[in-house]
Amino acid sequence: MSRRPVWIDGSDMRPAPLRTAAWLRACLLVGLSTLAMPGWASAPPCPQMTPEAMQNDYQALDARIARWDRAYYRQGQRLVDDGTYDSAKRRLAHWAECFPLLAKPSVNTHEPTGAKHHPVAQTGIAKLPDRDAVAGWVARQGDHPLWVQPKVDGVAVTLVYRHGRLAAAISRGDGVSGQDWYTKALHIAAIPSHLPADAPPLVILQGELYARRTAHRQSRDGTDGARARIAGLMARDTLTDREGSTIGLFVWAWPNGPDTMPERLETLAGWGFGDVAEMTHGVATAEDIAAWRQRWYRHALPFATDGVVVKRGDRPPGSDWQASPPDWAMAWKYPAREALARVDALEFSVGRTGRIAVVAELEPVLLGDKRVTRVSLGSLAHWRRTDVRPGDQVRLRLAGLTIPQLQEVVVRTRPRPQVDAPEADQYDRLSCLRFTPACRDQFLARLEWLGSDEGLDFPGIGPATWNQLVDAGLVKGLLDWRTLDTAALEALPGVGKKTARAWQRHFALADTRSAVRWLRALGVPAVPRQALTDALERYGMAGLGTLAPPDWRDYSGIGETRAMQLTRFFRDTDIRHWLASLESTRALQKQHGTNTRNEQKGDVRRVDVKQDNGTTWLPEQDSNLRPND
């Protein structure tokens, strides 16, 4: 089936005259810096847009991210999946690199910082996209010991113990300061109010508050709203003991603890934080990390996770930590089930029954472990309602394991590009029975159906064959293949005598197919098999055009709408002509008692034609003709 891609109008690409020189200098600098970056070939290209259009899209996406942040940090509502959020942040950063003269600092509403300063900064963590990036990071760590932990899906907290007593609990905030969560922490049973007597006078722990789960399998259960639930609870003015009992704690850092990971884990386990010791493992290669990532993704855990974290065991002292991702730790998240994607083009295709389908061609994006480049937008009417255009940023989600679906348009590019879409009223069940350039999609779809096992069953004759016959001008009407001779077929490029004769044998066998099967191949509207068989027995194929809607309604299972469709179908000029020709051929076959053998590659298949007033029976299990849509 041919494609009709629609691109943003080239006239929209011209930069404003007053900014042209600066624009070109900026783009040149960005281009040179991109070429110098390792792995530059995998980076998405910079959008080809005017400065004004780019600024509009940048501000629109920045505003949407700010809205997500406000909902998450202030109301505890998670409006989008992490995959969408992360890809939106990456896209914004990419645009800022592409257009440094236009980009403005992102105004994101992070968790309210409050007045409590972290004694050691919460660093955040760099997220690596794939195994190759992980392997590169591992190689850069040299001989430093590496440890892997599950990346718990919750909210970060800093706990401060002075002389064994809990003295402070601080939300992450901006990594430097956060909200005072001390009062709420006293209601969370997982946070001990005291440490053993042998604890150092000052203990600073960083960890994740998470929603307790029983046998949570990330591959099966997903995030399950776990992080949003905890964010919502901690955003409340008060927390009850009952609510606190649903919250767990995973300590992932002891900034002022012993120098080595084994020492830290042993002490933490002795203090009651045994889960961190059980779920922290030494690794040496990207393969080791991948194995733990897969294990924790598939196996039951007491919390939701969204990947793994790997860090050096001998990291710098906490006094050197900053509120930015360090080079001694990284995260490798699970495959995203949601992501943001840019629409590059729209493709319109007309199906066999005249239904117009719309597909968006995308800038490649990873969903699950799939590289997604296309997503269905449904029918022409549905596309018009969603109004997706090239340049738009859309949110995708995996349905099941493999099928991407459009969830919403996150950013509508401005100005809106013009789209040359086909008109729905140009195509229907009886359009394109003959080839014209505007009919190519539907005509080829008709031929493909006709030759499939749903139609006349031509083994080995598929879309490529029909394309070749149409392009050569040999098939201009739906049944022109019936009159092709061997010489015409052999003249086609790449088609030898053997192939030409095989095609002709299949074409010749079509005359032995049942009348019901022929009608289905031609695209008759869906109708109860018994009704069509009865009508054929009474009127024959050529006589069906004499029936009016009331005649069809006399048959069981046929209502007013279907009766009108059948009348229109059988009164079509081409359909009537073809049915008359077929009935004439079948009458001659019946007169001569045709028996046909199909010999192909040593397989002899006997085709016995059982005639019954010009009809034969389809398999018993096929009690109704299948719908044509």
Swiss-Prot record:
Q: What are the start and end residues of every segment in region (Disordered)?
A: 588-629
Q: What is its EC number?
A: 6.5.1.2
Q: Where is the composition biased (Basic and acidic residues)?
A: 598-611
Q: Known SUPFAM superfamilies for this protein? A: DNA ligase/mRNA capping enzyme, catalytic domain (SSF56091), Nucleic acid-binding proteins (SSF50249), RuvA domain 2-like (SSF47781)
Asked if the record carries the keyword Ligase, the reply is yes
| Catalytic residues, chain numbering | 151 (n6-amp-lysine intermediate)
Protein name from the UniProt record: DNA ligase B
Stored InterPro entries? DNA_ligase (IPR001679), DNA_ligase_B (IPR020923), DNAligase_adenylation (IPR013839), DNAligase_N (IPR013840), NA-bd_OB-fold (IPR012340), NAD_dep_DNA_ligaseB (IPR050326), NAD_DNA_ligase_OB (IPR004150), RuvA_2-like (IPR010994)
Arranged from A to Z, the UniProt key words for this protein are: DNA damage, DNA repair, DNA replication, Ligase, NAD
In the record, the note on similarity to other proteins reads:
Belongs to the NAD-dependent DNA ligase family. LigB subfamily.
Its Gene Ontology molecular function terms?
DNA ligase (NAD+) activity
GO BP terms? DNA repair; DNA replication
One matching Pfam family, short form?
Answer: DNA_ligase_aden
Q: Which HAMAP family does the protein's record reference?
A: DNA_ligase_B (MF_01587)
Task: Please describe what this protein does.
Answer: Catalyzes the formation of phosphodiester linkages between 5'-phosphoryl and 3'-hydroxyl groups in double-stranded DNA using NAD as a coenzyme and as the energy source for the reaction.
Q: Where is the composition biased (Polar residues)?
A: 588-597, 612-629
**What catalytic activity is recorded?**
NAD(+) + (deoxyribonucleotide)n-3'-hydroxyl + 5'-phospho-(deoxyribonucleotide)m = (deoxyribonucleotide)n+m + AMP + beta-nicotinamide D-nucleotide
Task: Please report any disulfide bonds recorded for this protein chain, giving both cysteine positions.
Answer: none
Top enzyme category: ligase
